[in-house]
Every structure is written in structure tokens, then in C-alpha cells.
């Protein structure tokens, strides 16, 4: 025969209370609003447990009404009460669940679920989150009746060394047919939590998608539901319409446009989680802020945890939406978020899924994908520099403006490559118009070779990684040597090279220029890039591309190395340097002019603009170019 203990008893906490409260207030939670989220989450867990146990024992649902959560503020005295009609707790469960930090109200229950391989959505961490209420309460009274039990019990504590457990008073027991009533005796500075608008604000922000109704019970009015009680991402795609997704996007993202892409799925297996992500159709104003923060919200069992969990890599920070885990604990601190292996697995899987969805969209709805790329391509390309594992997939997604006049994929580029062309050519700059006029394109254009024109700031970085696509390396037209000898010009009869005549003066001209310019350039070479212009500047064969060097120098992250000056031996200005009638002063002016006009064509100013203007005036007045 079992004897019911009806005596009141004071018990110590298994964990020292001051240390416990310090953990809650300082280590885990930074805002006091969180206490209500935790209590609502616990109530939701209790309702989940009741729903699960009632499958095997329907009588548990016989009394107590439909599952719901009630919040009751009272200003005389200052108490805030949270009530659920869930599974409830008996005496020992109150001691076990609320007497320690080490054991939560659902741990033993989870053991049963694990053995049954079912009900993962019932995971909870009741004991830990409950103590967050001491941030706003001087004392807490909990009265609970286990579903199907005749006894109700009251647990109470003022946050000292322990707690009291006793049979519930007749009045308290009468209020609770099943479930739990938590009464917070608020601190004076927490009186704001008695205001209806404050309660509604917190519920809207943190608990709107709890699947059970949350009712606010005012002192002078009728109870009313204050949450939507519908986690759309937990529903099947077959139940939802396009309009449902549009409305969800506006609620989740706080946006006014329509989504350009929607990704909704549920992952099952080692981890269970629901994903609902949207790509906006317009670019947010803070897309390129230095912090590069994402805007995907983390939920755990429909309870909002944070919007700052780095759930996706920075190059996907334009996405908006929700990831709702069934397995993560609710008490995730910032450090835990950064180091949690389960979260890392979710991030990896969801990132792969997003890239796959973008690839599918590019294939099946190219016009819709083009909208996303036009808005967020510069951000996605950051992944080419940062995400080595997915670089090839991201390269396949990328779209580039080219000299062919349209945005193309690298697959399209490779398909259109000229016979004997072995490299994918590109040019980086800060202006599309300036790139189109860049003299480094001349020889490629004469052969009909397509060139990628890259103008986003990130382009100078990701192209420095020595990438290839389909076995074809990417090659900058502003770095190192280029050789188009095996690719004929489009009109070979009109534009035949005369190498023997050109090479006759090559050594002389180069010697004159080197003597004049000294260490302003690292070398002077005859160009294979130029057909019409006199000169251009390129980077050497090793090290960063010229555009990246300039960017780093502007950011004071390194001095740009001396460029290589390439000259067109067939240009009259260059030929004038070999003219025996040209004196040293003219040769110096011509040499500097070749350097300075190349700088201007690259978007730079001459080192000494006044000296440049003087040289140009002298050459015009002397008619050197005309008679050269």
C-alpha cells in the first residue's frame, strides 16, 4: 500500500541558488523579456506531453478542456500567472523538475520517446528555463495536478537556499483540473509586465508560432487569444498556397515586396528540423554592412531563440526565414550557438539545399533566377572566395557580363570558346564602360574571344584563387603573359602581323623606355594584348591581379608592386621612340606619356598630373608625334 505524504516540507536546491540564478541572468539570457518565452515554452511542452500520453490513455484528456495557455496579469497584488492544462506534475516531479538545474522536466520522458523512436517534437528543457522567471519575480508559486491524479501540489520559493513543497490548498486545487499554474510575485521594477501591450509584444516576438492558443485574461475583460497558433513552416507544402507563402514572407521578414524564391522542406533523420526560407526580390539597404549578419531566425520547437545564430554562411545573408529545430536545447547561449555541432550540421545541410534550389531555379526559371542574381550576385560571389567546399557549385550558379553583351554562365562561355582556346579570360575593374574601352581587350576582340567583364568589389578577390571551371583555368587579361597565336584573327587578311619588321626595333625601344622610366615599372615588354592602343599596364605573372593590388593599396593593406608596361610595337607613338632624330628629352617625354596614358585608361591618375600636362603640351607643340 502506498502512503501519500501530505506534510509540508522544505528542501534544499541541489544546485546552489545564487550560482544558478547568475547562470540564468548573466550567462544565458541578456533580456528579462525572455522569462515569459521560457514559461510559455514549458507550458507548450506540457501540452505536447499530454497530447502524446493521451494517445495511449485517452482518459487523460477527459477533464480540463481544450489544450491552451493562459496569461493572467493582476495589479493588486502585482502577480503574473501563466497557466496550462497540460500533463501537470505530481509531488516527486515537482521536486525533480524544479529542484535542480541538472534535470529538466522532460529528460526522463525523452528516454521513453527515444526507445519508442517517436515524438521527437516533445523535447524540452523545463527545469533550466523556469528559473529565468527569478529575473523578474521575488518569489514564485507553482501549483500542479498530474493528469489523471486526484492530488494537487504546490511548490514555492523566494530564490533562496531551497524551496517548499506541500499539498495544494483546497482553493488552489479547485482551480486546476489538470496542468500547472505558475504565479510570479513581481519585483517592483518588473511591473511593466502586467501591461497587456507588453505581454502581447513579447508573445508576438517570441511565441506567436506556438501551436497552442495563448489567451490573455485581463482583470476587466474577456479572455482573448493573442497568438496565431500556427507555425506555417511545420505544415505540409501541399496544404499551403502561394498566397500563404507571400503572407508568411511578409510576417517573417518584415518585408513589403514579394519573395523571388521560396524554399520549404522538412528534414528527418539524425536531426529533425523544418526550413522556410525566402529570397527577397529587392536588395535590402544593409546588405553590405561590415558585420554581414544573416536574417534567418532560429526556433526550437516553435519557440523563437535568436536571429543572430549564423545559420547560413555570410554569402547567403540576403535570405530571410526560419529554421525550426526539434532537437536543440532552448537555453542556447551565444557561445553554445557558435560551438554546437548539431547547429553546424544544420547549417551545412541547409546551405547545400539552398544552393541546390538556386541551381534548379536557374535551370527551370532562368528569368526568375536572373532577378535574384541581379540583386544578390555580388553577395553570392563572396562564397567563391570563402567557401572552398562549394566553390564549383557556386561557379556554376554565377552569371557574368561579357564582351558578348549579355550575362552568361561559365557553362555557356565554355560552350562558345574558340578552337584552340584553353583558358577563360576575364578583366576586373570598377566600371563596365571603362572595361569595355580597356585596351587589354583589343587582341582578344580581334579574334572574337569572349571576355568576362567583372565590376563587383569581390571579383578582385575570388579571381585571385587560381580557379578553373570544367578544366579550363580562369586567366586575367591584366596579369602575366597571354598568347593568342593559335587562335586566328577574325579578318586575317586585313590585320596580318608583321613580326620580323616589329622585332627589329623591339630591343631599342624597350631600352629607351626603361632608361627613361627607371624603377617606376618592373619591366617593359612587347604586348600580345594590344592591336590599336600604344600601351597598357599589367601585373607580373606571380602575385595578385593588378586590380586587387590597387584595392589593397587603397585600403592601406599593402603597397602595390610596380606594374609591367606593355607596348604596341606597331603603334606610331612607340615607333617614334626608335627614330634616330628623337632626342633624349623627346624620348623621355614619350616614354612617360606611354606610362601615364596607360594609367589613365586603367582609371588612375598620373603620379604627377602637372608634369603629365606639361609633357603633353611639349609633344604637341614640337609635333613629335606628327613627324614620328
From Swiss-Prot:
Cellular localisation: Cytoplasm
GO cellular component terms attached to this protein's record: cytoplasm
Keywords: ATP-binding, Chaperone, Cytoplasm, Nucleotide-binding, Stress response
MF annotations from Gene Ontology: ATP binding; ATP hydrolysis activity; ATP-dependent protein folding chaperone; unfolded protein binding
A Pfam match: HATPase_c_3
Stretches for region A: 1-334
Family annotation (InterPro entries): HATPase_C_sf, HSP90_C, Hsp90_fam, Hsp90_N, Ribosomal_Su5_D2-typ_SF
Gene3D superfamilies in UniProt: 3.30.230.80, 3.40.50.11260, Heat shock protein 90, C-terminal domain, Histidine kinase-like ATPase, C-terminal domain
UniProt region (B), positions on chain: 335-550
C as annotated region, ranges: 551-628
Predominant location: cytoplasm
Subunit structure: Homodimer.
Function: Molecular chaperone. Has ATPase activity.
NCBIfam families: PRK05218.1
Family: Belongs to the heat shock protein 90 family.
The protein's name in its UniProt record: Chaperone protein HtpG
Originating organism: Rhodopseudomonas palustris (strain HaA2)
Source organism phylogeny: Bacteria, Pseudomonadati, Pseudomonadota, Alphaproteobacteria, Hyphomicrobiales
Gene behind the chain: htpG
Amino acid at each position: 500500500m502506498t502512503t501519500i505524504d501530505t506534510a509540508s516540507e522544505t528542501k534544499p536546491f541541489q544546485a546552489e541558488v545564487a550560482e544558478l540564478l547568475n547562470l540564468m541572468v548573466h550567462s544565458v539570457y541578456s533580456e528579462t523579456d525572455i522569462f515569459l518565452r521560457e514559461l510559455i515554452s514549458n507550458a507548450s511542452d506540457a501540452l505536447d506531453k499530454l497530447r502524446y500520453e493521451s494517445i495511449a490513455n485517452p482518459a487523460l484528456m477527459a477533464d480540463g478542456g481544450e489544450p491552451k495557455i493562459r496569461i493572467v496579469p493582476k495589479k493588486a497584488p502585482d502577480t503574473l500567472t501563466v497557466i496550462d492544462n497540460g500533463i501537470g506534475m505530481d509531488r516527486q516531479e515537482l521536486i525533480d523538475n524544479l529542484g535542480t538545474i541538472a534535470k529538466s522536466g522532460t529528460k526522463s520522458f525523452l528516454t521513453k520517446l527515444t526507445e519508442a523512436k517517436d515524438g521527437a517534437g516533445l523535447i524540452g528543457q523545463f527545469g533550466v528555463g523556469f528559473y529565468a522567471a527569478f529575473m523578474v519575480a521575488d518569489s514564485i508559486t507553482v501549483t500542479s495536478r498530474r493528469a489523471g491524479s486526484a492530488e494537487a501540489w504546490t511548490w514555492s520559493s523566494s530564490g533562496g537556499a531551497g524551496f517548499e513543497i506541500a499539498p495544494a490548498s483546497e482553493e488552489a486545487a479547485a482551480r486546476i483540473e489538470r496542468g500547472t499554474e505558475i504565479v510570479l510575485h513581481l519585483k517592483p521594477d518588473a511591473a511593466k509586465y502586467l501591461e497587456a501591450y507588453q505581454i502581447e509584444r513579447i508573445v508576438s516576438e517570441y511565441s506567436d508560432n506556438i501551436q497552442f492558443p495563448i489567451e490573455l485574461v485581463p482583470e476587466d475583460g474577456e479572455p482573448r487569444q493573442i497568438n496565431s497558433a500556427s507555425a506555417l513552416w511545420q505544415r505540409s507544402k501541399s496544404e499551403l498556397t502561394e498566397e500563404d507563402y507571400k503572407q508568411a514572407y511578409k510576417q517573417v521578414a518584415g518585408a513589403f515586396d514579394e519573395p523571388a524564391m521560396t524554399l520549404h522542406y522538412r528534414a528527418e533523420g539524425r536531426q529533425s528540423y523544418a526550413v522556410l526560407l525566402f529570397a527577397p526580390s529587392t536588395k535590402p539597404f544593409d546588405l553590405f554592412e561590415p558585420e554581414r549578419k544573416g536574417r534567418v531566425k532560429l526556433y526550437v520547437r516553435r519557440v523563437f531563440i535568436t536571429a543572430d545564430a549564423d545559420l547560413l554562411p555570410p554569402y547567403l545573408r540576403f535570405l530571410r526565414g526560419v529554421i525550426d529545430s526539434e532537437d536543440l536545447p532552448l537555453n542556447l547561449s551565444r557561445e553554445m550557438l557558435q560551438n554546437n555541432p548539431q547547429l553546424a550540421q544544420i547549417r551545412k545541410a541547409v546551405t547545400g539545399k539552398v544552393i541546390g534550389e538556386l541551381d534548379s531555379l536557374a535551370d527551370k526559371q532562368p528569368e526568375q533566377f536572373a532577378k535574384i542574381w541581379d540583386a544578390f550576385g555580388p553577395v553570392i560571389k563572396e562564397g567563391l572566395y570563402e567557401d572552398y567546399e562549394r566553390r564549383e557549385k557556386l561557379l556554376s550558379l554565377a552569371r557574368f557580363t561579357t564582351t558578348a553583351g549579355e550575362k552568361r554562365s561559365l557553362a555557356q562561355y565554355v560552350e562558345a570558346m574558340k578552337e584552340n582556346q584553353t583558358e577563360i579570360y576575364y578583366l576586373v575593374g570598377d566600371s563596365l564602360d571603362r572595361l569595355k574601352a580597356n585596351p587589354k581587350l583589343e587582341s582578344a576582340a580581334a579574334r572574337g574571344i569572349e571576355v568576362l567583364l567583372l565590376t563587383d568589389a569581390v571579383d578582385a578577390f575570388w579571381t585571385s584563387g587560381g580557379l578553373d571551371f570544367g578544366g579550363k583555368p580562369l586567366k586575367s587579361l591584366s596579369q602575366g603573359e597571354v598568347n593568342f597565336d593559335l587562335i586566328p584573327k577574325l579578318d586575317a587578311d586585313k590585320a596580318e602581323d608583321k613580326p620580323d619588321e616589329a622585332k627589329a626595333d623591339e630591343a631599342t625601344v624597350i631600352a629607351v623606355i626603361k632608361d627613361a622610366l627607371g624603377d617606376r615599372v618592373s619591366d617593359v615588354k612587347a604586348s600580345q594584348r594590344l592591336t590599336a592602343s600604344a600601351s597598357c599596364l599589367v601585373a607580373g605573372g606571380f602575385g595578385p591581379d593588378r586590380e586587387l593590388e590597387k584595392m589593397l593599396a587603397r585600403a592601406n593593406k599593402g603597397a602595390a608592386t610596380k606594374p609591367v608596361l606593355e607596348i604596341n610595337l606597331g603603334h606610331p607613338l612607340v615607333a617614334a621612340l626608335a627614330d634616330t632624330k628623337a632626342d633624349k628629352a623627346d624620348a623621355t617625354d614619350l616614354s612617360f606619356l606611354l606610362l601615364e596614358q596607360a594609367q589613365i585608361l586603367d582609371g588612375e591618375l598620373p603620379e604627377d598630373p602637372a608634369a603629365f600636362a606639361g609633357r603633353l603640351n611639349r609633344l604637341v607643340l614640337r609635333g613629335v608625334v606628327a613627324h614620328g
